[in-house]
């Protein structure tokens, strides 16, 4: 698992260009940023790769980065893209990018080109709760459950599916509520304008009728005197 994360970070970060130019590389399979820190003089260092992955500019606020992270996770979550290795890899890369950009300290170092493996192994980074299995040790098969008829169920049968409605409501509920209120105000304004237009039209009709009646009455009165 650690070696797989190392390969993902190599594809994720633009520092592979530095390796091709002969810069040293840390062989330790951590999060894969390399033990060497890159100064501002390294012209090949890209300070926008992680931002591009989340789809935000480098000037984005922490709230915008968090919203983009939730949006990307929603699009590429494995439960939503079952069987897609590309989506699973993209989901992992998005999570790793948010480890850096979601932290103000790590983001500042990344923007300056000073991010290293030591920073990612620091207390600000949450390690995985489940250790990677030893390749040499025998693997215990996952427990299987039995159905009511006594047959064995598949290991993934009891897997809880990802609740996209709850996810979207939890992270976008406030925005949805603002949009709902805005639509309600627009609808009320439209009805008010229609009512005023109809009221104005009725007044114009009444005014024209009254003017015609007044002119007709004047002609009748003049006719009597003539």
From Swiss-Prot:
Q: Which residues form the J domain?
A: 49-114
Q: Which GO terms describe its cellular component?
A: mitochondrial inner membrane; mitochondrion
An annotated GO BP: brain development
Q: Where in the cell is it found?
A: Mitochondrion inner membrane
- Renumbered to this chain, region (Disordered) spans 116-157
Range of the transit peptide:
1-38
Instruction: Write down what this protein is called.
Output: DnaJ homolog subfamily C member 30, mitochondrial
Membrane-crossing segments per the record: 208-225
PROSITE patterns assigned to the protein according to its UniProt record, in alphabetical order: DNAJ_2
Medical condition linked: DNAJC30 is located in the Williams-Beuren syndrome (WBS) critical region. WBS results from a hemizygous deletion of several genes on chromosome 7q11.23 thought to arise as a consequence of unequal crossing over between highly homologous low-copy repeat sequences flanking the deleted region. WBS is an autosomal dominant disorder characterized by multiple clinical manifestations including neurologic features such as intellectual disability, cardiovascular, urogenital and skeletal features, and distinctive facies. Leber-like hereditary optic neuropathy, autosomal recessive 1: An autosomal recessive form of Leber hereditary optic neuropathy, a mitochondrial disease resulting in bilateral painless loss of central vision due to selective degeneration of the retinal ganglion cells and their axons. The disorder shows incomplete penetrance and male predominance.
* InterPro entries assigned: DnaJ_domain, J_dom_sf, Mito_ATP_Synthase-Asso
Q: Which SMART domains match?
A: DnaJ (SM00271)
What tissues express this gene product? Expressed in brain, heart, kidney, liver, lung, spleen, stomach and testis. Highly expressed in the brain. In the neocortex, expressed in most, if not all, glutamatergic excitatory projection neurons (pyramidal) and many interneurons, with the strongest signal noticeably in large pyramidal neurons of layer 3C. Also present in pyramidal neurons of layer 3C PNs of the superior temporal cortex, as well as in pyramidal neurons (Betz cells) of the layer 5B primary motor cortex (at protein level).
Q: What is the annotated role of this protein in its UniProt record?
A: Mitochondrial protein enriched in neurons that acts as a regulator of mitochondrial respiration. Associates with the ATP synthase complex and facilitates ATP synthesis. May be a chaperone protein involved in the turnover of the subunits of mitochondrial complex I N-module. It facilitates the degradation of N-module subunits damaged by oxidative stress, and contributes to complex I functional efficiency.
How is the protein disposed in the membrane? Single-pass membrane protein
Q: What residue spans carry the Pro residues bias annotation?
A: 130-144
Family annotation (Pfam families)? DnaJ
Q: How does it assemble?
A: Associates with the ATP synthase complex. Interacts with MT-ATP6; interaction is direct. Interacts with ATP5MC2; interaction is direct.
Q: Does the keyword Methyltransferase apply?
A: no
Q: Outcome of altering residue 51 to C? A: In LHONAR1; results in reduced turnover of N-module subunits of the respiratory chain complex I and reduced complex I activity in homozygous patient-derived cells
Alphabetized UniProt keyword annotations: ATP synthesis, Chaperone, Disease variant, Leber hereditary optic neuropathy, Membrane, Mitochondrion, Mitochondrion inner membrane, Primary mitochondrial disease, Transit peptide, Transmembrane, Transmembrane helix, Williams-Beuren syndrome
Principal localization?
Answer: mitochondrion
């Amino acid at each position: 698992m650690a070696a797989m994360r190392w390969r993902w970070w190599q594809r994720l970060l633009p520092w592979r260009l530095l390796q091709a130019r002969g810069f040293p590389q840390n062989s330790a399979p951590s999060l894969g940023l390399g033990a060497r820190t890159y100064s501002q003089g390294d012209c090949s260092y890209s300070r926008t790769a992680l931002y591009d992955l989340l789809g935000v500019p480098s000037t984005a606020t922490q709230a915008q980065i968090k919203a983009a992270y939730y949006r990307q996770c929603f699009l590429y979550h494995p439960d939503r893209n079952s069987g897609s290795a590309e989506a699973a890899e993209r989901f992992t890369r998005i999570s790793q990018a948010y480890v850096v950009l979601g932290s103000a300290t790590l983001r500042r170092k990344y923007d300056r080109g000073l991010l290293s493996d030591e920073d990612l192994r620091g207390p600000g980074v949450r390690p995985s709760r489940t250790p990677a299995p030893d390749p040499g040790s025998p693997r215990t098969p996952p427990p299987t459950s039995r159905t009511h008829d006594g047959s064995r169920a598949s290991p993934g049968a009891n897997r809880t599916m990802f609740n996209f409605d709850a996810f979207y409501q939890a992270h976008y509920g406030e925005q949805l509520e603002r949009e709902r209120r805005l639509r309600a105000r627009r609808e009320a304004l439209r009805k008010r304008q229609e009512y005023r237009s109809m009221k104005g039209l009725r007044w114009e009709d009444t005014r024209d009728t009254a003017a015609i009646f007044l002119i007709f009455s004047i002609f009748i009165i003049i006719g009597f005197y003539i």
